[in-house]
A protein has these predicted regions:
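Residue-level recognition of single "structural anchor" positions
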Residues: 1-247
């Protein structure tokens, strides 16, 4: 019954898994492993931590529908100065690229990816994976985006005009996402997120953000259950080993 799903070979009763999933999705800002351990009465922090990481990995479906229309794209550092970083490099900081659909004056769906650097070799594959060809990609003038001129996208470039104009004014939607993401990581997880596991947390943030207009927390729970039964199983060792490879 559970073979080929997130629940394969689990020693935890499915009823407890469902309680964990409900708690994770019913809380507006999610839940930390420490809080989940306390709520479910688990004796092991590792059990709660592994459960949450398995569920975070299930939140993102391979082959999901890509963003479309006009999409802003930019990068920012977690834990560092997010404005005007010369050369796009800060030693020891985590770099995240964000794509955000324009929805009138608001934000549509988003995608996020933890990347090692802001080169075209990292940025263009993210755009191709995340944004439908034929869409308009709106970026700043960073050279890593220049190959978009020959790709299957319309490329709109906005450059800062002097020091009085902020990057957040040129690309307001992605910078709003930067701010919300940072606040969420600090609020729910007190900023205690290891860089090698950051992508899993970004998956959860995107899952929540893209369903923020849902009137029912039950819908998030239902979607997570759907994803969990359609996701290949992952063991604790696989989670740890994949994190080591990301370092």
């Amino acid at each position: 019954m559970t073979a080929g799903t997130v629940f394969q070979d689990t020693r935890t009763p499915l009823t407890v898994w469902f309680r964990a999933m409900w708690w994770l999705t019913s809380q507006k800002n999610g839940v930390s492993a420490v809080a989940l351990q306390r709520v479910l009465g688990w004796g092991s922090y590792q059990t709660a931590w592994t459960c949450l990481h398995k569920l975070r990995r299930a939140m993102i479906r391979p082959g999901r529908e890509r963003l479309a229309g006009v999409v802003e794209v930019d990068e920012s550092y977690l834990g560092g100065n997010e404005q005007g970083v010369l050369g796009r490099h800060i030693a020891g900081k985590a770099l995240v690229v964000v794509a955000a659909e324009e929805d009138g004056r608001g934000i549509g769906r988003i995608r996020l990816r933890h990347i090692p650097d802001a080169s075209a070799a990292r940025l263009i594959p993210f755009i191709e994976d995340s944004i439908e060809p034929g869409s308009t990609v709106h970026t700043d003038g960073w050279y890593g985006y220049l190959p978009l001129r020959t790709a299957a996208y319309q490329h709109r470039i906005s450059n800062q005009k002097g020091h009085s104009e902020r990057a957040s004014e040129l690309l307001p939607r992605v910078h709003q996402v930067f701010s919300l993401r940072k606040r969420w990581l600090l609020g729910t997880h007190q900023g205690a997120v290891a860089g090698e596991h950051l992508q899993d947390y970004l998956n959860e943030f995107a899952f929540r953000f893209n369903r923020r207009k849902s009137r029912s927390r039950g819908k998030l729970f239902y979607r997570l259950v759907q994803h969990a039964v359609a996701t290949e199983p992952t063991t604790y060792r696989q989670i740890v080993d994949s994190a080591i490879k990301r370092k």
